[in-house]
Amino acid sequence: MSENRTRFRLDQRRAPIYEALERFRQMRVVPFDVPGHKRGRGNPELTAFLGQQCVGVDVNSMKPLDNLCHPVSVIREAEELAADAFGAAHAFLMVGGTTSSVQSMVLTVCKRGDEIILPRNVHRSVLNALVLCGAVPVYVNPEVDKRLGISLGMKREQVEKAIREHPNAVAVLVNNPTYYGICSDLRAIVKMAHDAGMLCLADEAHGTHFYFGGGLPVSAMAAGADMASVSMHKSGGSLTQSSLLLIGPNVHPGYVRQIINLTQTTSGSYLLMSSLDISRRNLALRGRQVFHQVADMAEYAREEINAVGGYYAFGKELCNGNSVFDFDTTKLSVHTLDIGLAGIEVYDILRDEYDIQIEFGDIGNILAYLSIGDRPQEVERLVSALAEIKRRFRTDGAGLLSQEYIDPVVAASPQEAFYAPKKSLPLRETEGMVCSEFVMCYPPGIPILAPGERITKEILNYIEYAKAKGCSMTGPEDPDILHLNVLA
């Protein structure tokens, strides 16, 4: 703990929201406010399911507990502690998931007609924000690893070219890392953006642990980025839907708060906020040790899975100094096509036959998300199951597709296409038309098609193949994705 104590200005042993809730619990306040379950008394089934400890602190904003929309006491203290722990100028507690963090980032820096430079393999929340604000994407289409079929990071020269050709762009957005653990050269991209008078934003939905792990890729704040969206619930241990928005010294926190309050709830969940508070404390005090163990577990799993044969659990050997500048070694991503199975097929078999739930399976890969709650015995069970799946279900792989990412042809801005007059056509009749809605596999939530992109035969083949293999498809108005909305 002494090493950690030297890293922080504030007392990271504190958890102000949690402490305030504990004080409130002892006060025995009579509730004539919302929520209507009145500390669980009005909904005994819910109380029996979640427990009195939980529903007893599902409370509304009040003076002793502060207000998320305008924090002045315990929430403000919790945000100051989070900023200190993550090396940011300011931090905001977010209760709408990292989707709300990402959208707040984009809405802070972009207005209608502004250009923003970004990779096309972004989460849908980024493109949702462009629909809302009317900004225009300047895509840096990433390279694809031919063996794995996955998109890589942005090359430095690609970003430099985009900045040179679009000098009026307001920001560059970077994935740090991608879902698969791929990192771009963030420090170099931050410098290029700043030299051109642009801000640099980082989607760090999968990079919470970068702030607390030795030997892991550089975090956005350490690289000098201006804003970063951090999914504390993914690898940091907080409750699902809780997140952080971090900002650097070049961004005005008061304006960011106004942007957040445009879309975030006025009834912030104290369950989510206290989970952020407690998890931040845990990471500040023990994060380095814990994530060192997580990285060791993932490395062990990679070695064991590769020893099985047929699978390829990839890691730092992908690094090439540019489009794969670094790799997140806690990510256990496994290529499955060489055993004749799509990633989504292995995903389904693991759940249905072995009671193992992994993060996702796509066309050619699976991802097992290792974090602070995993233990070696579960890793052993996963390795054993994969070995048995190879023995029981291996095929010759005839007819398998390999490529995850297809470069889009952009014909209109996301906002223009989303709100334009549209018509619904059978899927196969949409070739050559401009899409007006999203189509994606979820997870990972990276659009196959976004509003404003031209529909190609290759994309239609991919959609039909993904549906046939059992990928969970979301986005279109037609839930069966037999029809797509296109510009009229």
Specify the residue positions occupied by each region the protein language model found:
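Conserved C-terminal alpha-helix-loop-beta "cap" of PLP-dependent enzymes
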Residues: 300-475
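N-terminal "arm"/small-domain region of PLP-dependent enzymes with the aminotransferase-like
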Residues: 1-73, 444
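Hydrophobic beta-strand scaffold residues
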Residues: 137, 200-201, 358
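Active-site PLP attachment segment
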Residues: 219-258, 264-275
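Structural signature of PLP-dependent enzymes
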Residues: 279-302, 378
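Conserved N-terminal alpha-helix of the aminotransferase class I/II PLP-enzyme fold
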Residues: 55-97
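Active-site phosphate-binding strand-loop segment of PLP-dependent enzymes
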Residues: 148-209
